[in-house]
Amino acid sequence: GRINQYRVVEAVKLWRKMLTRLFETGHPWITFKDPANIRSPQDHDGVVHNSNLCTEITLNNSDTETAVCNLGSVNLSRHVTAEGVDHELLSRTVSTAMRMLDNVIDINFYPTEEARRSNMRHRPVGLGLMGFQDALFKLRHPFDSRGAQAFADEIMEFISYHAILASSKLAAERGAYESFPGSKWDRGIFPLDTLDLLEAERGVEIPVPRTTRMDWTPVREHVARHGMRNSNTMAVAPTATISNIAGSYPCIEPIYKNIYVKSNMSGEFTVINEYLVNDLKARGLWNQEMLEELKAHDGDVGRIDAVPAELKELYKEAFEIDATRLVQLTALRGKWIDQSQSHNVFMKGVSGKKLEEIYMAAWELGLKTTYYLRSLGASQIEKSTLDAKKYGYTQKREAAAPKPAVAAGSGAESALSGGSNGNGTGAAGSAGDAATGERPTRIAATAVTTDAGFAASIANMSSATEITNICSLDDPDCEACQ
């Protein structure tokens, strides 16, 4: 008889199971097929069936072609000072990197003919960035501020502008890639334009602003005249290893911990955020007692009374930042990128409703892919070098404080959208406001969901076992979450 290779399942039940497995294991890495394909420059020549392991590559695959992408990353920490971005240096770096990556295509080793064929026909490259957190530290922008949103938008537009222009200049010098005719580039459709295509396909608004700071007319005219050397130009990889070598923070992520223990063949040693140390020294606050406080509170400066409010805002760790705010930053960068970004989700609590809110916000804002879900355990290694009488026992983490519900469109929501400026105050600085306009408010509006959401889906489950698994997500005291 005929074997059915599929079965019909209820979408809501499948979604619940996906979120449960995600919370339990950090997998699966949720990828959205509609933006990955609708926004692909190569929609005329195949289908994006999957991403790569780190979820930043969205290229076509088939039985005759295996997608291959050569990657490189711009170290923002080398292009940003307290005075701002060195745009001249950054433009040269991007142009040099694009030429380098195009050269790699020709001299690379290909394990299969399918891989060689794909790379030679389409010549995709993935230029990304790292040291985003370094740049924000230097510019004094907290990660969840309007200034950070404005910077994410501005810096990615600049990199996109010069990456696309560099590829087109290479096309004028070396010729356009083989499958260029019929591509979005050939039709005059750039990454920013594809948000409108996605919006039209879904029939709902993609609440990401389409504003630009640069004059794109020369780039569009150059591409129309000479074509593109590379089918794809940008992708933000995790850069965990190369950023460590370069001495910067990885890719687009906030600082994981202000203090941690690093291990290598030479042994173990304590690493402390040098930006934080320098700021504390400048204020006369860096001493042995402050070091002990940092150790006791696992690097969370928000729990140290002696640290000024400005520094508490600037040096928030990844788990102290609302995950939906990080999604918003990725959406602002993503509108300029023709592939995707390795976006890790950091969640401090154990709320199933919050987990759904984060991933629904990612879809609504048009993200193509997500990477690991990273969560904090309820316990940690006991800090035996600290005075237990003074600091108490340090093996159990404090539960995340619940946040008050915010009605959509309320003044409180607008304040959340703006976050804080570089001075640690609640209002955004005038420069950030002028640069962003209504951007943060529009984006933040998508992160507000009804209380019914995930909680209602739990109530409707028919399996007692499934109910137990899901309910544990909302129970901080559940042993399964320890």
Protein language model regions, located:
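Polar, glycine-rich mid-to-C-terminal structural blocks
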Residues: 1-25
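Alpha-helix capping and helix-loop boundary segments enriched in small/acidic/polar residues
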Residues: 5-9, 42-45, 58-63, 81-92, ...
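Function-dense linear segments that define catalytic or interfacial modules
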Residues: 22-119, 124, 131-139, 248-275, ...
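Structured core elements
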Residues: 24, 29-32, 70-75, 124-126, ...
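A glycine-rich phosphate-binding loop feature that marks nucleotide/adenosyl-phosphate handling sites
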Residues: 32-43, 114-125, 149-154, 169-197, ...
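Catalytic alpha/beta core of large soluble enzyme barrels
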Residues: 58-60, 101-106, 176, 209-213, ...
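Internal maturation/activation junctions in enzymes
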Residues: 93-116, 142-239, 309-313, 341-342, ...
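Acidic, low-complexity intrinsically disordered tails
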Residues: 384-482
